[in-house]
Regions:
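Membrane-embedded beta-barrel scaffold of Gram-negative outer-membrane proteins
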Residues: 307-337, 477, 483-489, 508-569, ...
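Transmembrane beta-barrel wall of Gram-negative outer-membrane proteins
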Residues: 204-274, 296-309
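C-terminal beta-signal and adjacent terminal beta-strands/loops
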Residues: 628-634, 660-712
Length: 712
């Protein structure tokens, strides 16, 4: 189990790797809380952590899990989120090498996240988990995050695993895994209240983010935590009213010394107006205005999961875990549609119709797995992970069109997709030379059966996909500080309901992922370098003009990621961080566009931050840079009159944050952060975003934030 104290740091963690008695946790909690107010005593009680069996290749998504991990990986802590002035999940990811974000709202409600050049729209090529449970609407048939039921205030950290996890975490793992880790239940009952107020230059009303959490252990065997997050207001543009409510409850129940149940329940409701893109002329006139008055969004989701953990008395150590999860979700996009000529989404033309896309999702899954450790104290060790998963998805997929001038509503699409997906996986981490060298072969098999029904045409078609997905990771501890690693894994993205379009014959998108790199870790100083390559077969690409998908064939994504953190021994109050990504993402299919850059991919990405602590205050200057990118496969440089094609210019954004504890003792603390995002008011934009794909989509300008957080 995990718990945290008033400083927000996880003191003892358990779960798949180890089990602690409640007495030991109480001792650790008391020790760490007294340490806030007093020096360490001579006779301290120390809780030793012994990791014997590991049931997850990514562990608990802690900083400690990164050091020897056999792939490129970044963990963003709550402290880093605060100091870099991140106001949303997508904003927190901006400085991670290989991640690019199209921030269409400034509120984080509908993030568009690209990993290593994969398409960003609705984060459909990024596999998101929350506490290890799939977050996406449908892991197989609809990977696009057109509901993103997560808010930054409820997170403790974010784990971005770019390589090495495909065997256990699939499908849709071409770009790796992003695990959102919620705040753990504290051992001593704790309440947290925070309010974050953001004012945008040019905005009409502020955006307010209120968060409340209370929880702890009610007895030696039962813990409970309740959370609520309310986001309300506007961003920097007209037609951007936002109202989000996010409620979570989690519980832990120790059935015995060897058995535990963890439960999670969430209700998420979001409504937001979508200001849409602007024509180049309107953008130059006033980038804060909106020309898409009919564009709106609503999303609702009820999610749950129950996990049973049982330590077993065989091998040197063994553990059984059974995870069940599910959700019932609804979402509705509404947007203006022009059917009178020109591009349907041209923001300079008036809409003739209003389209809606109501969709409903019912998902259920169960995943039992076993972890077994052999060879304790020997020169050769083995950590086996064997698991299987069943997921059922029921998707209703509609499209309606209503003339603004009046008339009957048409239903161009009325589809249904029922999916039964079975997966099995096995891996064995073999430790050689006293775990100096770790080699992990693994295999995942996916068997997906889809039944597609076009209710309007009264047609039904079946589609079955079976794929064997091998993987191999290697990590070598050169010294206590240096680790070299390499991995190769085959990844899958199952056929999507929007791709099938009634044919029932579309195949999967497949890719081979390769990485080789090295990592240095010494106290707070670290460095990582990774070369990566993704060989993608049969990549499908959305064409907004025809609203169909094209198979663009083979694509190649390759590059170099660098990241470093330096804390000088002579000046520990200073912390310097930097990252760089070089990405060459190209079309490889024979034809006129072979060798061209994939749309929306920047070759160069930089991230940086510098924090200096003095007189009880932390000051941080941070930022990111992305080079220019193209909009189409032909790599057209000149912008056309509508803004549908043309280069997207490079941009550089600076942020500033000042944080200090206004009050702190062993019973509680009150912390204040003052931030300025986009310090120099860089004006930049994106293209090609979902329901408004034509024109320039403005990114947020300068904003000012006051954040107060009280824990007691």
């Amino acid at each position: 189990m995990s718990y945290q104290n008033l400083d927000g740091k996880v003191r003892v963690r358990a779960g798949l790797s180890t089990t602690y008695s409640v007495l030991a946790i109480a001792i650790a909690s008391a020790t760490s809380m007294s340490a806030v107010a007093a020096p360490a005593a001579k006779n301290e009680t120390t809780v030793m952590e012994t990791v014997v069996v590991t049931g997850s290749v990514i562990g608990n998504s802690d900083i400690e899990d990164v050091k020897e991990y056999p792939g490129a990986r970044t963990v963003i802590t709550r402290d880093q989120i605060e100091k870099t002035a991140a106001g949303s999940i997508d904003n927190a990811l901006q400085r991670v090498p290989g991640i690019k974000v199209q921030d269409e709202s400034g509120t984080g409600v509908l993030p568009n996240i690209s990993v290593r050049g994969l398409k960003a729209s609705r984060s459909g090529h990024a596999q998101f988990l929350m506490d290890g449970v799939p977050l996406t609407l449908a892991p197989y048939g609809h990977t696009g995050q057109s509901i993103f039921p997560a808010t930054l205030s409820m997170l403790d950290r974010i784990d971005i695993v770019r390589g090495g996890a495909a065997v256990q975490y699939g499908p849709n793992n071409v770009g790796g895994v992003i695990n959102l880790v919620t705040k753990p239940i504290p051992y001593t009952w704790q309440t947290e209240i925070s309010n974050r107020l953001t004012v945008f230059d040019g905005g009409d009303a502020p955006l307010n983010d209120f968060y409340l959490r209370t929880g702890g252990w009610l007895s030696d065997t039962f813990a409970l935590q309740l959370e609520g997050n309310f986001l309300k207001g506007e961003s920097f543009r007209e037609h951007s009213d936002t109202d989000v409510k996010n409620f979570q409850a989690k519980a832990q129940w120790l059935l015995s010394d060897t058995q535990e149940i963890q439960a999670f329940l969430q209700r998420y409701d979001a409504e937001t107006q979508m200001p849409g893109a602007l024509s180049p002329q309107d953008y130059e006139q006033d980038r804060h205005q909106s020309k898409r008055p009919y564009d709106d969004y609503e999303g609702k989701s009820t999610r749950w999961s129950v996990k049973y953990i049982h330590d077993l008395p065989f091998a040197d150590s063994a553990e059984l875990e059974v995870l069940t999860f599910g959700h019932k979700s609804e979402r509705l996009f509404k947007w203006g549609f022009n059917s009178a000529g020109g591009h349907w989404a041209d923001p300079a033309l008036p809409a003739t119709d209003v389209r809606t896309s109501p969709r409903e999702f019912t998902v259920y899954g169960i995943e039992p797995k076993m972890a077994m450790y052999f060879g304790e104290g020997k020169s050769v060790t083995q950590n086996w992970i064997v698991g299987t998963r069943y997921v059922n998805e029921d998707i209703d997929y509609k499209l309606t069109q209503t003339p603004i001038a009046g008339g009957a509503t048409k239903v161009p699409r009325d589809w249904h997709l029922d999916t039964d997906a079975f997966a099995g996986y096995v891996s064995n981490e073999i430790g050689l030379f006293n775990d100096t060298l770790k080699v992990t072969p693994g295999l995942r098999v996916e068997s997906v059966r889809m039944t597609f029904t076009d209710r309007g045409k009264k047609q039904t078609a079946d589609n079955k996909v079976t794929e064997w997905l091998p993987g191999l990771t290697v990590a070598y501890n050169v010294t206590d500080q240096w680790v070299t690693y390499a991995n190769a894994q085959k990844s899958l993205r199952a056929p999507q309901i929007a791709y099938i379009r009634g044919l029932g014959e579309e195949g999967s998108e497949l890719a081979w992922n390769y990485e080789v790199g090295a990592r240095y870790t010494q106290d707070a100083t670290s460095f990582n370098a990774a070369l990566y390559r993704i060989d993608f077969e049969d990549q499908l690409q959305w064409q907004s003009s025809t609203q169909t998908f094209d198979n663009i064939g083979k694509t190649l994504h390759q590059g170099l990621e660098l990241s470093a953190r330096y804390v000088p021994e002579v000046l520990p109050a200073l912390s310097l961080g930097a990252s760089y990504n070089y990405l060459d993402a190209t079309l490889e299919e024979e034809g006129a566009n072979k060798g061209n850059q994939l749309p929306y991919t920047s070759k160069h990405q930089l991230g940086w931050d510098a924090t200096y602590a003095f007189y009880g205050m932390d000051t941080t200057l941070s930022g990111f840079y992305f080079s220019d990118s193209y909009t189409d496969n032909a790599n057209t440089s000149a912008e056309d009159a509508t803004g549908a094609t043309g280069k997207v210019p490079s941009y550089m954004v600076w942020n500033f944050n000042l944080g200090t504890d206004l009050y702190k003792d062993d019973k509680g603390k009150l912390r204040m952060n003052v931030a300025v995002n986009n310090l120099f008011d860089e004006e930049y934009y994106f293209r090609g975003i979902d329901t408004s794909p034509v024109g320039r989509y403005p990114a947020p300008g300068r904003s000012y934030t006051l954040d107060l957080n009280y824990q007691f």
